[in-house]
Amino acid sequence: MASVVPLKDRRLLEVKLGELPSWILMRDFTPSGIAGAFQRGYYRYYNKYVNVKKGSVAGLSMVLAAYVVFNYCRSYKELKHERLRKYH
């Protein structure tokens, strides 16, 4: 018989749609909890793409691509006006 995992300990993909609001309210939204979530995400990314036996530049290039897309989205408002100019 499978053991029942409490709602607080379930991952997001294991939560049913009806349980989602109560699952979100159980999360830790303190600064240390948010920092811990970012730290866990960083370690998961690092161990999956960077810290591997046969590593390549794929993991670092994904970070660079995300950085470029983020900065483009951030400055799109100014770039949009320059695109419409004819000479300068």
UniProtKB/Swiss-Prot annotation:
The gene is ATP5MF. Keywords: Acetylation, ATP synthesis, CF(0), Hydrogen ion transport, Ion transport, Membrane, Mitochondrion, Mitochondrion inner membrane, Phosphoprotein, Transmembrane, Transmembrane helix, Transport. The modification Phosphoserine is found at residue 3. Component of the ATP synthase complex composed at least of ATP5F1A/subunit alpha, ATP5F1B/subunit beta, ATP5MC1/subunit c (homooctomer), MT-ATP6/subunit a, MT-ATP8/subunit 8, ATP5ME/subunit e, ATP5MF/subunit f, ATP5MG/subunit g, ATP5MK/subunit k, ATP5MJ/subunit j, ATP5F1C/subunit gamma, ATP5F1D/subunit delta, ATP5F1E/subunit epsilon, ATP5PF/subunit F6, ATP5PB/subunit b, ATP5PD/subunit d, ATP5PO/subunit OSCP. The keyword Transmembrane applies. It is a single-pass membrane protein. Subunit f, of the mitochondrial membrane ATP synthase complex (F(1)F(0) ATP synthase or Complex V) that produces ATP from ADP in the presence of a proton gradient across the membrane which is generated by electron transport complexes of the respiratory chain. ATP synthase complex consist of a soluble F(1) head domain - the catalytic core - and a membrane F(1) domain - the membrane proton channel. These two domains are linked by a central stalk rotating inside the F(1) region and a stationary peripheral stalk. The modification N6-acetyllysine is found at residue 16. It comes from Sus scrofa. It is found in: Mitochondrion; Mitochondrion inner membrane. The chain crosses the membrane at residues 62-79. GO terms for biological process: ATP biosynthetic process; proton transmembrane transport. The lineage of its organism: Eukaryota, Metazoa, Chordata, Craniata, Vertebrata. Belongs to the ATPase F chain family. The modification N-acetylalanine is found at residue 2. GO terms for cellular component: mitochondrial inner membrane; proton-transporting ATP synthase complex. It comes from the Eukaryota. This is ATP synthase F(0) complex subunit f, mitochondrial.
